[in-house]
């Protein structure tokens, strides 16, 4: 029976997403990734070279996934609250992504990030969409488009970054539907003409 390299590689990537999200780069173990994937750990070295390259591939794959799943065009930017709701939904369904970014941030020493030029271009296209929408009069111009985009990213992710703060501030366990509705309302208010803080 032939070895299914594509399936094995994907199983390793899937297992690595969970391992790196749970433990970060330093805490992740190649042995656990192999065990989770049901594959000999030597396959990791065969397909990815080393742990650093595997982490890079995991992060790159997850970044591509969110970029293609939730694009932002000028038309979509007209309802920035809806976009924020989509981000919230994504983070809720795939919490590993935001955890991977936080682990990457904890390791940041000021040098270039993985695929930084490509990521900068992706962010830039979204900022440009917001700028076009602002020029068309559909969004508040009191904030720079970069500030507005960054605020939306932060607002959508923070619920999942510090769930303990959500419990303490809101006085109880998480209520995803209420959180999502609040986020959408807040971003719409922030983005509407005259809504800047």
Identify the residue ranges that each predicted region occupies:
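Amphipathic alpha-helical segments that line or abut small-molecule/effector binding pockets
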Residues: 14, 77-106, 120, 146-150, ...
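N-terminal intrinsically disordered/low-complexity leader segments
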Residues: 1-7, 197
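Short coil/turn segments at alpha/beta junctions that flank glycine-rich nucleotide-binding fingerprints
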Residues: 22-26, 94, 136
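C-terminal peripheral helix-coil segments that are non-catalytic and often amphipathic
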Residues: 89-93, 124-136, 154-197
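Amphipathic alpha-helical linker/stalk segments
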Residues: 56-83, 117, 123-126
